């Protein structure tokens, strides 16, 4: 109906467009009207022109509407005829259904004509005087057919029995497979839950352990750094001492060289002394001789005692000098020996310092390597987290697919038989529970994932903090090196002062004693440093052992994580396969039920159905074998989980052993290990409790499955009863077959066919009656709509007539106004020519004018009210009736003087 109205609207718009060209050319009557309207304002003239156009188009619209109404009535009559005589409910369906309906009628007519021809031929071929031989032949043929039918019936009975047995086996297998699959699904869900919980616990434990290990490593790093700083300070002090000693050694070497020179000079002098003494003796002798000779000459009285006294004086002087020289030599030799001892001590201290520097450098390199390993471990953990996130997304996708498959399974279960509705409801509830559990598990896993991410961020922040500490400590090292440089400068100044002091021999002795004391002090410090170095080496060895243990534990955890991921992937794949198999089995069940129902009607093609059922049974047997294999694989997986639990207990035992071995260490480490042991024992207890819960759940599930098995047995019993009913129907069919054999006349077959045709015709008639009833209801609705539209159209006509009457009244008033003006101009001329008689006429004219004005004002008010009412009705109709908005839009735009933009805005606001 709405399509017809839209077509009517299109036709009207086309006719209006055609009529516009005719309307554009003004007629002489319009010209006269325009001349008449010249006295009115421009707005009213424009509106009147529009109304005149609508006046000319109105009869066209009426005629078009009447034609379309006649067409719609004819179409309704055609629809009624088609609905009464054909299965067509709507004209829209006529294109598809009418040709098929006529083809079916033609086929039926052809079949009836063929049967009539066959019957007429049979009647013509059979002569009235049929011979006895032909009758005997027919009887023999009939008996043979009877025997063949009996044999076929026996074969069918045997096949039916075999089919019943096969159906029982198939149903049992199906029940077993369904129960096994449900058990597997529940077991897999429990395993997945346990694995997720175990993973979460393991991850939490590993994170806590990593935090503890990081804290321990941080403490160890800080201790090692403190030790390194102390060693560096000691090295700097030792280096200062070494420099002092080297400067002292240099000074001593200089003094030694000077003393050696002095010694060489003294040796030369010692060598030259005997020669000088001999020369002196010779000179003295010569002098003595000369003196003697002089004395003999001068005095002649000098004694021999004087000569001897002079000789003794000279010898005593030489011996004293020689003794002094010997003492100096001995002192120099002793000092030289002390310098050699100093050299040896200096070389020993240098070697020790070099060894200490090498050890400290190696320790620093090791600590740097440990930091690098920690950074790599952090990067690996981040990568593993990313992999876990990707695996999470994959698991979500898998769960979505599983949900979609479950929805498909729901739809298939809805289409199944009414007897399985209770089971379907239980399965739906289980599926909803599974979905809810999956959603909760995903949410929990996401929350844990966020917690792990936050923990990793905290760890990364801690690592950055450690790096900052390293940089700060490096800065402290640079400051300490600067301090060392300053100390070196001070030491150089001190050495310069010492060089000034060492020029004097007296100060050397005191400095020597002080140096001996400092050497003893340095030796004690070296011993202390060596002890500290041993302690630091032991601590580093312990740290290495702890790091090795932690790395081994991390490797084990990673391997366990990988194995668990692989198990999850396998379980998810097996879960999907089980769902697919479940869907396939449900489809097969539906197919078997449909085929079982079709067995009642199918008689001739029973062998083909038996073959197909056998194939399906074979396929089901194969699937049963596969399901048993999967059950075995799941049992193996359970054994593997038990082995994992045993491995964890072994790890706990090993940790206990480690705790017993490490009892000799500090009390803090012992407490930490005891806490770890307690945590692991709690984990073990939790795992044992979870295993007990799983066993209890499995026991309850077994009881539930037993209950379902009993229900399925009851269903099997019902199916057996149905089979017995079918057997009874088969017996009835046998009786019918015997009756048919007794009936030899062909007319009986024809009558049965005719009865079937009549039953089919009755069914078609009942369907046609139903369709006719539906069509009548639809027609009534359409009639109501049509009446409403007619009423609306009548209202529009009334409004249009009132407008046209108002226009005519306006035109008449305009004519009367013009005639009044002409008469007024004539009366004014007569008044100008007249003298006294015009005074009463002048007095009467204003009263008439006032009456005319009052009447015109009343008429204008009434016209305004009518226009307002008309506009109101049009607006209300436009807002109430969506169907007529396209038709009323130009009227509203004309009344309200709307532009194209205003029209668009109005339409958009209404939409």
Swiss-Prot record:
It is found in: Cytoplasm; Golgi apparatus membrane. The modification Phosphothreonine is found at residue 830. Pfam families: GRIP (PF01465). Induction: By cold. Residues 861-909 form the GRIP domain. Residues 16-41, 271-314, 814-850 are annotated as: Disordered. Residues 822-847 have a biased composition (Polar residues). Residues 286-299 have a biased composition (Basic residues). It is a peripheral membrane protein. The keyword Protein transport applies. PROSITE patterns: GRIP (PS50913). The modification Phosphoserine is found at residues 308, 660, 827. Signal peptide: none annotated. Keywords: Coiled coil, Cytoplasm, Golgi apparatus, Membrane, Phosphoprotein, Protein transport, Stress response, Transport. One of its GO terms (cellular component) is Golgi membrane. InterPro entries: Golgi-autophagy_related (IPR051952), GRIP_dom (IPR000237). GO terms for biological process: Golgi to plasma membrane protein transport; response to endoplasmic reticulum stress; vesicle-mediated transport. Residues 101-280, 312-735, 766-814 form a coiled coil. Present with 2350 molecules/cell in log phase SD medium. Forms oligomers and is present in high-molecular-mass complexes. Interacts with ARL1. Involved in vesicular transport between an endosomal compartment and the Golgi apparatus. The GRIP domain may serve as a Golgi targeting domain through its interaction with the ARL1 Golgi protein. This is Golgin IMH1.
């Amino acid at each position: 109906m709405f399509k017809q109205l839209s077509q009517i609207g299109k036709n009207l718009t086309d006719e209006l467009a055609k009529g516009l060209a005719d309307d554009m050319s003004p007629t002489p009557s319009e010209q006269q009207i325009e001349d008449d309207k010249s006295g009115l304002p421009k707005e009213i003239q424009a509106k009147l022109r529009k109304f005149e156009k609508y006046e000319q188009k109105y009869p066209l619209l009426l005629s078009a509407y009447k034609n379309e109404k006649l067409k719609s009535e004819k179409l309704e009559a055609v629809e009624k005829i088609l609905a009464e005589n054909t299965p067509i409910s709507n004209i829209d369906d006529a294109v598809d259904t009418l040709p098929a309906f006529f083809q079916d009628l033609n086929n039926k007519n052809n079949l009836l004509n063929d049967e009539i021809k066959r019957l007429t031929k049979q009647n013509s071929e059979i002569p009235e005087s049929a011979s006895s031989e032909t009758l005997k032949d027919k009887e023999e043929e009939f008996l043979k057919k009877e025997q063949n039918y009996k044999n076929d019936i026996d074969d069918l009975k045997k096949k039916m029995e075999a089919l019943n047995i096969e159906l029982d086996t198939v149903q049992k297998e199906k029940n077993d497979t369904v129960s096994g699959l449900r058990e597997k699904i529940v077991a897999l869900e429990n395993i997945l839950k346990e694995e997720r919980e175990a993973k979460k616990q393991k991850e939490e434990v590993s994170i806590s352990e990593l935090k503890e290990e990081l804290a321990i490593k941080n403490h160890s790093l800080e201790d090692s750094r403190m030790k390194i700083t102390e060693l560096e300070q000691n090295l700097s002090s030792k280096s200062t001492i070494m420099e002092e000693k080297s400067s002292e050694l240099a000074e001593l070497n200089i003094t030694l060289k000077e003393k050696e020179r002095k010694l060489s000079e003294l040796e030369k002098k010692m060598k030259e002394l005997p020669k000088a003494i001999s020369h002196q003796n010779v000179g003295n002798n010569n002098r003595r001789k000369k003196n003697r000779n002089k004395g003999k000459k001068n005095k002649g009285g000098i004694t021999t005692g004087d000569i001897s006294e002079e000789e003794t004086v000279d010898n005593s002087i030489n011996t004293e000098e020689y003794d002094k020289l010997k003492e100096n030599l001995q002192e120099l030799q002793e000092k030289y020996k002390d310098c050699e001892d100093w050299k040896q001590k200096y070389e020993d201290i240098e070697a020790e310092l070099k060894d200490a520097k090498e050890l400290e450098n190696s320790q620093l390199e090791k600590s740097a390597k440990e930091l690098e390993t920690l950074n790599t471990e952090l990067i690996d953990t981040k990568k593993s987290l990313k992999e876990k996130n990707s695996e999470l997304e994959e698991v979500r996708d898998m769960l979505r697919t599983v949900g979609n498959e479950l929805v498909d399974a729901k739809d298939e279960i809805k289409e199944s038989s009414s007897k399985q509705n209770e089971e379907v409801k239980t399965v739906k509830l289980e599926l909803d529970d599974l979905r809810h559990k999956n959603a909760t598990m995903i949410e929990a896993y996401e929350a844990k994932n966020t917690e792990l991410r936050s923990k990793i961020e905290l760890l990364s922040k801690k690592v950055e903090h450690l790096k900052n500490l390293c940089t700060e400590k490096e800065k402290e090292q640079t400051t300490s090196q600067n301090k060392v440089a300053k100390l070196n400068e001070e030491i150089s100044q001190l050495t310069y002062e010492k060089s000034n002091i060492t020029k004097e021999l007296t100060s050397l002795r005191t400095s020597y004693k002080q140096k001996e004391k400092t050497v003893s002090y340095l030796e004690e410090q070296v011993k202390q440093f060596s002890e500290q170095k041993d302690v630091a080496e032991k601590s580093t060895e312990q740290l290495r052992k702890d790091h090795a243990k932690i790395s081994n534990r991390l490797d084990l955890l990673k391997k366990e994580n990988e194995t668990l991921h692989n198990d999850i992937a396998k379980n998810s794949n097996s879960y999907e396969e089980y769902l697919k198999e479940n869907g396939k089995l449900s489809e097969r069940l539906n197919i078997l039920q449909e085929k079982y129902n079709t067995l009642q009607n199918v008689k001739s093609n029973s062998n083909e159905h038996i073959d197909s059922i056998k194939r399906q049974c074979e396929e089901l047997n194969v699937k049963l074998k596969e399901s048993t294999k999967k059950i075995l694989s799941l049992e193996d997986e359970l054994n593997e989980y038990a082995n994992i639990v045993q491995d964890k207990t072994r790890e706990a035992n090993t940790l206990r052993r480690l705790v017993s071995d490490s009892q000799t260490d500090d009390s803090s480490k012992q407490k930490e290990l005891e806490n770890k042991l307690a945590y692991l024992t709690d984990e073990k207890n939790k795992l044992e409790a979870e295993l007990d819960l799983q066993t209890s759940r499995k026991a309850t599930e077994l009881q539930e499955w037993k209950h379902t098995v009993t229900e399925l047995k009851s269903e099997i019993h019902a199916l057996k009863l149905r089979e017995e009913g079918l057997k009874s129907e088969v017996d009835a069919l046998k009786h019918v077959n015997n009756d048919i054999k007794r009936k030899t006349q062909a007319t009986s077959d024809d009558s049965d066919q005719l009865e079937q045709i009549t039953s089919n015709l009755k069914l078609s008639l009942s369907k046609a009656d139903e369709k006719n009833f539906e069509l009548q209801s639809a027609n009534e609705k359409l009639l109501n709509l049509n009446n409403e539209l007619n009423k609306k159209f009548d209202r529009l006509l009334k409004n249009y007539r009132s407008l046209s009457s108002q226009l005519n009244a306006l035109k008449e008033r305009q004519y009367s106004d013009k005639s009044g003006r002409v008469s007024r101009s004539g009366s004014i001329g007569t008044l100008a020519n007249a003298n006294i008689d015009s005074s009463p006429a002048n007095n009467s004219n204003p009263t008439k004018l006032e009456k005319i004005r009052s009447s015109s004002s009343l008429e204008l008010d009434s016209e305004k009210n009518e226009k307002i009412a008309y506009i109101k009705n049009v607006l209300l109709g436009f807002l109430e009736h969506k169907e007529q908005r396209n038709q009323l839009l130009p009227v509203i735009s004309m009344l309200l003087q709307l532009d194209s933009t205003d029209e668009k805005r109005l339409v958009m606001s209404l939409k």
